[in-house]
A protein has these predicted regions:
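Conserved AMP-binding/adenylate-forming core of the ANL superfamily
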Residues: 38-42, 90-91, 108-162, 179-184, ...
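Conserved pre-ATP/AMP-binding loop-to-beta segment of ANL
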Residues: 104-106, 229, 242-277, 284, ...
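AMP-binding/adenylate-forming catalytic core of the ANL superfamily
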Residues: 149, 174-199, 214, 347, ...
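Adenylate-forming
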Residues: 152, 194-213, 234, 343-347, ...
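Structural core segment of the AMP-binding/adenylate-forming
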Residues: 166-252, 361-362, 369-370
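AMP-binding/adenylate-forming catalytic domain of the ANL superfamily
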Residues: 226-231, 595-620, 632-656
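Conserved AMP-binding/adenylation subdomain of ANL enzymes
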Residues: 294-314, 324-364, 379
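Conserved AMP-binding/adenylate-forming
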Residues: 305, 393-520, 527-530, 543
């Protein structure tokens, strides 16, 4: 067994929601264990008992009871969950507004890039949702209709989602940094009736006008009957939008109605709630439909139990409305916590911007990406020395595997006594397969545990479950947050092909990972980016972990290039400004990789590039780079934040020999 880098103290364990849930499950159900391993095993062996316990422990509000919890967990896709139950997602998230102890509590705090701050209580949030619900009714929004948002991460975005869901309508959002083609490829598939849009946004100290894009979206997507424009950047009043008959400004629309009691539309457990999108780097984005009940109970499980979120907590996650972590974040309202929203660049005007917010708001749970932690470490920034982080209890990291060095950085330069939970799942399940745990120690490079109720295993090439070795991450039992399906996917053909074409009745997630003897999980990268030199499978994250040790490298991307009837590893690196790749640095990189992995991991070629292509949510795109290197078309570049970067990889002389 390895030595942990952090362990929870007995008091923290005893006071945790996870511990309280174990007591609850022992008293009310047939669970008899006293540790996480036994609880996890019970959740897999008795899924009906576990998910019913979760429903009751989290006090989900429903107008009709369920007839049964699940009909058959071996049926994937197609398992029925909580059949007969009727509920409303927004009603559950706004429930603190009906509690005298929490209705005046701050629900949301918003920070803009310029430092402007706004806050809203649960009662005022309820009132604004009530007003917008009345607006949407006048706009003829009904159960099942789609409302699309082209919005920054603001209070208005949360109000828009809650009002939409209160009516039983379906919410879908993109961040305003999406190009017009990227927005069209997404929203035109789902035919929204209403568009909620911003007149602009701020990033890296610049104000970016979106008025022309909003007008073009409204013109091109003919299903849009009404447009609500949020005057976020101050450009609306002098724009062409003010003269459009189907367009109204947000404040103007809400001011026409007084807050009244919301009639929450009661819908079945499996009723569509969100439409999220795949990255779209291999074609038109897939429209992934997530359910009301599945999203709610899964997020409550992850917030209450795995994150140990409580009413007195303040939760922050750096995200945009175009990333599933936004959907995950806003579900924290159901717990009664205070959520902190931020829109802008995470390191503008300096690397301290998010940590200043953490100090000012006394944030207890701070969520970010692995890439961000690596970036501020390379900047030499030490939040623990600059900021008072005494309230900080948990740091969450996702988006890509968190390197061993980033674990060291957090405990050395941010805070010694903090639960650093690397989490992994995806848009596909709007949640996590592996994540944090208040009961368990932290080991460098590992996610603490598999999520309760998630039958996660690693399969070898023969489809056999393996421990302590690398394999395909799969889920062998149905789970509530499995998508309803893809939008407009006749007979679920694309949905089945995406997740169930590799194994029968087994979800293949597309991650390459490992289950450890400590009970944790290691993610080695995406399966479609796995390198295969000489027939040996290597996850790209194994290489990135070593490259991050070389301080002059800001970012890297590795691919496999077909070469002489085999595959060879190619590593591209972006260096600090003013530096150049020479033989000494190449030798240092290769030596670092060889000494910490195997000779097979050592790249055949290391090439300097000025930029690394990435998605709008910050994920590097190995598949797109591999396609360009091999002269294959990249079908959809509108999902990339910097599509022009792909040109650096085309027809490289270095790869011709």
């Amino acid at each position: 067994m390895k030595e942990p880098v952090w362990e929870p103290n007995p008091s923290r364990i005893e006071q945790s929601n996870m511990n309280n849930f174990m007591v609850f499950a022992r008293e009310k159900f047939d669970y008899v264990g006293h540790n996480y391993e036994s609880l996890y095993r019970w959740s897999i062996d008795n899924p009906s008992g576990f998910w019913e316990a979760m429903w009751k422990f989290s006090e989900i509000i429903a107008s009709k009871p369920y007839k049964f919890v699940v009909d058959d967990v071996t049926k994937m896709p197609g398992a029925l969950w909580f059949e007969g139950a009727e509920l409303n997602f927004a009603e559950n998230l706004l429930s603190p507004a009906g509690d005298d102890q929490t209705k005046e509590k701050i629900a949301l705090v918003f920070y803009g890039e310029s430092g402007d701050r706004k806050e809203i209580s649960y009662q005022d949030l309820y009132n604004q949702v009530s007003q917008l619900t009345q607006v949407l009714k006048v706009m003829d929004v009904h159960e099942g209709d789609r409302v699309a948002a082209f919005m920054p991460n603001t209070i208005e975005s949360v109000v828009g989602m809650l009002a939409t869901c209160s009516l039983g309508a379906v919410w879908s959002s993109c961040s305003p940094d999406f190009g017009i083609n990227g927005v069209f490829d997404r929203f035109n598939q789902i035919k929204p009736k209403v568009l909620i849009a911003t007149d602009g946004y701020f990033y890296n100290g610049k104000k970016i006008d979106t008025v022309s894009r909003v007008k073009e979206i409204g013109d091109k997507i003919t299903s849009i009957e009404s447009i609500l424009v949020v005057n976020f950047s101050g450009d609306y009043e002098n724009s062409v939008l003010i003269h459009q008959a189907n367009t109204i400004e947000w404040e103007n629309a809400l001011s026409r109605y007084k807050p009244i009691s919301i009639e929450f539309k009661q819908v079945p457990f499996n009723h569509p709630l969100y439409i999220l999108y795949s990255s779209g780097t291999t074609g038109i984005p897939k429209c992934i439909v997530h359910s009301v009940g599945g999203t709610l109970i899964q997020h409550l499980k992850e917030h209450l139990l795995h994150t140990d979120l409580k009413r007195e907590d303040t939760l922050f996650y750096f995200t945009t409305c175009g990333w599933m972590m936004w959907n995950w974040l806003v579900s924290g309202l159901a717990v009664g916590s205070t959520l902190v929203l931020y829109d802008g660049a995470p390191i503008y005007p300096g690397p301290d911007v998010l940590w200043n917010i953490a100090e000012n708001e006394r944030i207890t749970v701070f969520g970010t990406s692995a890439k961000y932690l690596s970036a501020i470490e390379k900047e030499g920034f030490k939040p623990g020395e600059r900021n008072n982080l005494s309230s900080l209890r948990t740091i969450l990291s996702t988006g890509s595997p968190l390197s061993h060095e980033s674990f060291d950085y957090v405990y050395r330069d941010i805070k010694e006594d903090v639960c650093l939970s690397s989490i992994s799942g995806g848009t596909d399940i709007v949640s996590c397969f592996a994540l944090g745990n208040p009961l368990l120690p932290i080991f460098r490079g590992q996610l603490q545990c598999r999520g309760l109720g998630m039958a996660v295993e690693m399969f070898d090439e023969d489809g056999q479950s393996i421990l302590g070795a690398k394999g395909e991450l799969v889920c062998t039992q149905a789970f509530p947050s499995s998508p309803v399906g893809f939008w407009n996917d006749k007979d679920d053909l694309k949905f089945k092909d995406a997740y169930f074409s590799t194994y029968d009745n087994v979800w293949a997630h597309g991650d390459y990972g490992e289950l450890t003897e400590e009970g944790g999980v290691i993610i080695h990268g995406r399966s479609d980016s796995v390198l295969n030199p000489g027939g040996v499978r290597i996850g790209t994250a194994e290489i990135y972990r070593q490259v991050e040790k070389v301080d002059v490298i800001l970012e890297s991307i590795a691919i496999g290039q077909q070469w002489k009837d085999d595959s060879r590893v190619i590593l591209f690196v972006r260096l600090r400004e003013g530096l150049r790749l020479d033989e000494l640095l190449v030798d240092k990189i290769k030596k670092t990789i060889r000494e910490n992995t195997t000779p097979r991991h050592v790249p055949s070629k290391i090439i300097e590039v000025p930029d690394i292509p990435r998605t709008l949510s910050g994920k590097i795109v190995e598949v797109a780079v591999r396609k360009v290197v091999h002269g294959e078309p990249v079908k959809n570049t509108d999902s990339l934040a910097n599509p022009g970067a792909l040109e650096f990889y085309r027809n490289l002389v270095e790869l011709q020999c």
